[in-house]
Amino acid sequence: MNGNQKLDAYNQEKQNFIQHFSQIVKVLTEKELGHPEIGDAIARLKEVLEYNALGGKYNRGLTVVQAFQELVEPKKQDAESLQRALTVGWCVELLQAFFLVSDDIMDSSLTRRGQICWYQKPGIGLDAINDALLLEASIYRLLKFYCREQPYYLNLLELFLQSSYQTEIGQTLDLMTAPQGHVDLGRYTEKRYKSIVKYKTAFYSFYLPIAAAMYMAGIDGEKEHANALKILMEMGEFFQVQDDYLDLFGDPSVTGKVGTDIQDNKCSWLVVQCLLRASPQQRQILEENYGQKDPEKVARVKALYEALDLQSAFFKYEEDSYNRLKSLIEQCSAPLPPSIFMELANKIYKRRK
């Protein structure tokens, strides 16, 4: 398959995935929309789903489907099993939506995926907390509806619950490392940064979609999952460093969001690298300006990052990390096809959104 054919196939898969969303909404809402007691709440759920689950890149959800198609022999890929793979892919997207709606409130974010954050919409506000919980609850309703009779049902339930817990522990580390209104640069170490990323991003963004497909394909051995986890945790760190870079140096018209890591006092890759390179005077500039909403102070921090040439440091990191990933995939992917991991790595390498 040449580059254009691959792109066409990917776009077709993406279209199929997006089309399945209407089925997801139907299963979650259709029966109860006219319910005399909870009809209004179900209409709200439908609105929450349609606003918050759509509009992303769908990488996590599509990864489930693509990995399932690679791991399951073609004769076992009937219409029903593909429906289940699409649904589990959407469960990963709903988990992502649950995290993003919550995260945007905690970070006082303004935009997400090129539109105003859900909680910022008139009449929504902190009711969005309950909406986020509805998104999470929808995952388990879908898994029960589509997968209850499957041998992997319990493994999927445990995987989603574990993914939520890991991510929430990561978010706790993130919030504790950077409490609002209190800047302590001593907390921003590489060790703490790696811990936050491992728990907050890598597990649900990379291991969850691949592990879900593995369970659906009947691959449930500890060794296979441990090897996949090793590769995917490394990939998750690579992805988060990119995210931190794009938060400040990305183009909001491409990324779909306006970054706030400096204002939010975040333990981001950029601030960790800045501290490793800064002179005492430069550290003082960071002390005086980091973690504050004033646009002039934010601009001073950005100027400091530019003076330390953190953009070049990022490009070097991206190259080194990609090469490290390739060797790790060669060493650890068996018995899974290396292509599963390489396709994922190539999808995020040099991404700009």
UniProtKB/Swiss-Prot annotation:
Entry keywords, A to Z: Acetylation, Cholesterol biosynthesis, Cholesterol metabolism, Cytoplasm, Hydroxylation, Isoprene biosynthesis, Lipid biosynthesis, Lipid metabolism, Magnesium, Metal-binding, Steroid biosynthesis, Steroid metabolism, Sterol biosynthesis, Sterol metabolism, Transferase
Any one GO molecular-function label of the UniProt entry: metal ion binding
Subcellular location field: Cytoplasm
Modulation of this protein's activity: Inactivated by interferon-induced RSAD2. This inactivation may result of disruption of lipid rafts at the plasma membrane, and thus have an antiviral effect since many enveloped viruses need lipid rafts to bud efficiently out of the cell.
Record-listed E.C. numbers: 2.5.1.10, 2.5.1.1
Keyword Lipid metabolism: yes
Chief location: cytoplasm
InterPro entries on file: FPS1-like, Isoprenoid_synthase_dom_sf, Polyprenyl_synt, Polyprenyl_synt_CS
Binding site for isopentenyl diphosphate: K57, R60, Q96, R113
Binding site for Mg(2+) 1: D103, D107
Gene Ontology biological-process annotations: cholesterol biosynthetic process; farnesyl diphosphate biosynthetic process; geranyl diphosphate biosynthetic process
Pathway: Isoprenoid biosynthesis; farnesyl diphosphate biosynthesis; farnesyl diphosphate from geranyl diphosphate and isopentenyl diphosphate: step 1/1; Isoprenoid biosynthesis; geranyl diphosphate biosynthesis; geranyl diphosphate from dimethylallyl diphosphate and isopentenyl diphosphate: step 1/1
Catalytic activity entry: isopentenyl diphosphate + dimethylallyl diphosphate = (2E)-geranyl diphosphate + diphosphate; isopentenyl diphosphate + (2E)-geranyl diphosphate = (2E,6E)-farnesyl diphosphate + diphosphate
Site (Important for determining product chain length) location in chain: F98, F99
Gene3D superfamilies registered for this protein in UniProt: Farnesyl Diphosphate Synthase
Subunit structure as annotated in this protein's UniProt entry: Homodimer. Interacts with RSAD2.
PANTHER family: FARNESYL PYROPHOSPHATE SYNTHASE (PTHR11525:SF0), FARNESYL-PYROPHOSPHATE SYNTHETASE (PTHR11525)
Descriptive protein name: Farnesyl pyrophosphate synthase
Species annotation: Mus musculus
Lineage: Eukaryota, Metazoa, Chordata, Craniata, Vertebrata
